[in-house]
């Protein structure tokens, strides 16, 4: 019996139902394809996961979230099914397809920094999604621009629920998330709540307006230390932005999570009142379609080279990981990335090679990878370095 039998949409082979068209994302344990339904000709994204025994937990976690959501909310990525391919021992997760990818890749591709009306509209969409998640007692725990996907109808949708959790099941001893966007209370293992997502949203705004998250010049573990020692409380260049935007970000980044506003309160903020009509994002997409698709076509010519470069980098990162079950290690030093379920994932220093591990160093790959949606979510029990910094979905 397959571990996933109770979760499958049907036991039909996915090869009988879908034709894979194009590779759009790569991870160490999964690949994402643009695919077409053989029956309806509808386009989907299909996440094909291998090493499924090792990755059981995050896969099931995401599936359970999607089952809870039932595609009820327009600001959450839609889920259409899960299938098992026996020949390859792979799980196929059928998801909504996003031609334009995540919001940061899209903006980078068209070389556009959002004005405050567009930014307010983007963030309002994210808040609508978070309002729904939090109403279901779900904490996302990985809010960042790479997990905010831009749909053709002009909505921002939240994706990637591999480490999401019911707020009643939180174990504060687990440090989970993407380091640059991680809230102080998660890092210090406080009894955090859904307002950790609000902090990550504040960092996401910082990323969208500044081009990168705070402390991105440092390796992830060092950045986590700095988040605690010298918390980010505002945008880097406040004088460039309105009072409303600066105030909104400061509220999100309040170090005391009990003092942070909740989603409903943020939706009433003056900055969000700057958001445009429901057609604003759709019109923005249409105005930039020509430039976007020219950039996309240019990228496609180098797709194979990009895949090889990514796999080399990912292989290097994975080869420098060591599992450590010593729960007494409390200090976040230069090596520790994340703790989860009694496992400690450690990035080992390698003096013979330069480790490309900080956000800014990784950005040099972004011109090649701008169209790839890196969607894997590494469970710390997989002994794999979390490559979220490579522009994942």
Predicted regions and their residues:
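Protein kinase glycine-rich loop
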Residues: 21-27, 32
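Conserved N-lobe beta3->alphaC-helix segment of eukaryotic protein kinase catalytic domains
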Residues: 43, 48-72
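Short beta-strand micro-motifs within the conserved protein kinase catalytic domain, predominantly
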Residues: 78-88
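Conserved short submotifs of the Hanks-type protein kinase catalytic core
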Residues: 88-102
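Activation segment signature within eukaryotic-like protein kinase domains
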Residues: 122-123
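Conserved catalytic-loop aspartate of Hanks-type protein kinases
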Residues: 197
